[in-house]
């Protein structure tokens, strides 16, 4: 386990493949000579105005609000069919293997809401996840601060990976999958805590003039939510974020659904968190394990890609709209996620004679 962490956090990311999550910007000034200079130069070829416009275009593309044409939507569904409709096929693929569950939180277990501090999951969903964790090893993998997402879920028997996988902690109690006397804690970006706190404070100050903008400190990353910002103010918001980030060459900007994410440039993401957790559970390099990862965000693509590249398990994208994805299947909304999880529990219980 220690070897796995060392191999993945001691190297800065390659400039051509920082993450499967789209990188909008890497911090630093034009004269910076760090390993990220080439990426920064590429982003600044068109100078400020062009850069901001490209950000805004990417912000729109990452947060679709309406379906594409009927034909394109239909083609997408054929390529990424409903996990509910293909449930028997999924069970067939997992036959004879240990299923391990990985779940995003926002937009997957809870609905997307205007106020991120009120993204509560329903009691019914919590009960479903509780039953799921009795049947399979289960982890919550979120961009949120680990303590925050844990306070939302309120289940001590789960593994939690917060800050896009940069803050991982094993079950406190109640998990039959936790190794005896195992105290699991992985925080590969600890050295970045002071700079993230500093950037968070500056972002709060710089975005105060933009109505609806909300900055969240997620411990090892900072999030700028723009769900409640009028679209004609997005360029102003992007400008303010860039004005802060340009002074921090070891940070990068990625994005999700109506959110900009400021993260350390280290070789760690939700995909690495998935691999770390599988190793912690004793399933590294195993052929008899079947990870299922369910998520709705672009940051989940790192995990989807790991599973696709390894031809191991499968990814399920939660989305009503066609999106480019490495996931194999789709579900439209958290309610469908709950139905899928309930069916998994029922199937497992029937196999165990429960």
Curated annotation (Swiss-Prot):
It holds the Pfam family Trehalose_PPase. Keywords: Hydrolase, Stress response. One of its GO terms (biological process) is trehalose biosynthetic process. Its cofactor is a divalent metal cation. Removes the phosphate from trehalose 6-phosphate to produce free trehalose. Trehalose accumulation in plant may improve abiotic stress tolerance. CDD domains: HAD_TPP. This is Probable trehalose-phosphate phosphatase E. Transmembrane segments: none annotated. InterPro entries: HAD-like_sf, HAD-SF_hydro_IIB, HAD_sf, OTSB-like, Trehalose_PPase. PANTHER family: TREHALOSE 6-PHOSPHATE PHOSPHATASE. The gene is TPPE. Its EC number is 3.1.3.12. Pathway: Glycan biosynthesis; trehalose biosynthesis. GO terms for molecular function: trehalose-phosphatase activity. Belongs to the trehalose phosphatase family. It comes from Arabidopsis thaliana (Mouse-ear cress). It catalyses: alpha,alpha-trehalose 6-phosphate + H2O = alpha,alpha-trehalose + phosphate. Induction: Not induced by trehalose. The keyword Metal-binding does not apply. NCBIfam families: HAD-SF-IIB (TIGR01484), T6PP (TIGR00685). GO terms for cellular component: chloroplast. It comes from the Eukaryota.
